[in-house]
Amino acid sequence: MLIDSSIAQAYIESSCVDAFRASWLFEHTSVSLDLGRNAFTPPPEDLALRETVRKLERRICEAAAHFVPVNRPIWDALFPDWEAVQPTLDLIVGYPEPYDAVAAHSPDGQAHLIFDLIRWCNYAELDQLDSVIRNLLTHEITHLLIGHRYPAADAALESTDYLTRLDAYTFHEGFAHLLSYQATEIDCVDWHTPQLTEVAAASRAKLRLALMETDPDRQKQFLEEAVCGSYYEKFACMCGMLYLADRWEMQGIDGLKSAFADYHGFAQRALSIRI
């Protein structure tokens, strides 16, 4: 994995990071698409924050150098050539909340993971920081691997058709959340806790409403709530993840391979969660 920490380093060294405003990292990613503008947000001029960013930059570089994905056997099955996909990890500052980790492709088509280290300051004091890094690397690289293996599902994320986009969101986020969940191997997760049972019911109810919605303004709101907000309230992410956990429990790797074969209609299929 290549690492480009030039923006984070400029901030650490008190250089002018505003010079990076025109970079594609702020102009041409899902963040700028979500915001409808250049995503650059001037970072605070704070010495203590700079020191935290410096420590985070070092820890993330060390973890990335020795990265092993969570649920590697599933990666091996779904993405057999995953080791040939070598993304660049961009360590930056300048994204607004809540964009801490983003998968993207540069204008020349190269795969990138973008970590905003000021947003990562929320995790800086966690004892399990290495686990958080592994979780987010697994999550974001899964998005890149889906795009590499299944370009149509990737393109559908920006479709102008509401249901196509909802399918793509549920598919993409379902797999990314499943494979990275709590940085824990899938067989070691209890998918039937009272909390997850409640999350499944609430997410399924909201996804059902989203699938029936015809008003353009409400559709836009549903698409935002599908993948944004607090972790367990992102209904498309949760429905997709728990549906796939169901498939795993019933059919193992074969169930996940079958689910990966077609994103079309995935949101509707995700309503069949048994959890």
Where does each model-flagged region fall?
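N-terminal mature-domain "stem" immediately C-terminal to a signal peptide or N-terminal signal-anchor/transmembrane
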Residues: M1-R50
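Pan-zinc metallopeptidase signature
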Residues: H192-I275
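Auxiliary, metal-adjacent structural segments of Zn-dependent hydrolase domains
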Residues: V53-I114, D130-S131
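Short pre-active-site segment immediately N-terminal to the catalytic Zn-binding motif
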Residues: I118-L137
